[in-house]
Amino acid sequence: MVNRILYFLVLVMSFFSSKGQTDSLIPSKKHKLIIGNDSNVVFSGTRIITKTDTGNIHKIELSGYVSAYYAHYSDETINNGFVQFPTMAPRNNQFGLNLAQLGMEYHDHKVRGNITLQYGDIPESNWPKPFTLIQEAHAGVKLVKNLWLDAGFFKSHIGLESIQPRENITSSMSVIDYYEPYFFSGAKMTYQVNSKLTLQVNAFNGYNTYIETNKNKALGFSALYDVNDRISLTYNALTCDETPDNKKTKHQRFYHNLYGTFKLGKVSFGIEVNYGTQKNSKLLDSTETASMNSSLVVFKYQAFKKVGIYGRVEYFSDKNRILTGTLNLGNFIYGGTFGIEFKPSKNVALSTEYRVLQCDQFIFKEKNYLSNQRNEVIFCLDVWF
């Protein structure tokens, strides 16, 4: 039965890509079905470049992924059953499901498309209700050599950390990337200058939204430079105004995101730096431009073939609440993470990690009192194909 379903998918995708060729419904060497070919996906989740040119081969890639966890937090759940900064492992003192996702991707030398369906605590705590089942749904066409136009729903390309735990070193998401977009709705134009440099311009409905909230659009630019197969540098810029149309005072936002990934022997690490400004947004003077900044460093040491040790330090400062809104984090929040990962096979990962967050405001609730510190312990199991 499974073989028949897969064969049917090949026929359908071949039909839409054949453009009237009489023999296109017969699977041949020009058609390739791939199931679960990715094993090492760390740092891949937010890269701006995807499949670009596969020659005359029509490829269909099917994938599946399940991420389960148990988490303990020293603070209480106060946000619809989730802890403060809910993304990965957001439920306290219980087993949970981060993600269960199924994806299908099609690409050849002129057309490509991707649809990924999802379910779990990550979309439940962060996606708008009508769209919780959709992680990605977009299609693309090659306009000229090395120039692609894609449109639809995208997961975010901004930030070092992805919303999929398997694509990160840690099993938790930093406060930095929690306040960066998770998803976009719009269009991207991507040009691969050469094997090292890729440029992209994009237009979206807004900052972390599917449905437009005003008449303004978010505009962005990205540049990816692969120094070699071990070192990669990415710069993202985004400008938008989320002010409702009926408000006279506007708040134009400019967000700059720079990160690098490095894989040097047994050591892998990433560095991210962010800087943002927003007009008419200072708390003490609403006519002045406010700013925020953040940074993180994450690393992993492959101590043995199947065992890795990892850590992360993070810093986030948004005293004028450009991104945090009504939540007062004061001048800063910083944290440290330490964990151990065991990979019994290439597409399975077991991790245990400890994290501490320290804020200069008392934002965490512990029983009958407030605290400026949170301790976390997370156990995570990731399996994918």
Describe these PLM feature segments.
Residues M1-S24:
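Bacterial Sec-dependent N-terminal signal peptides
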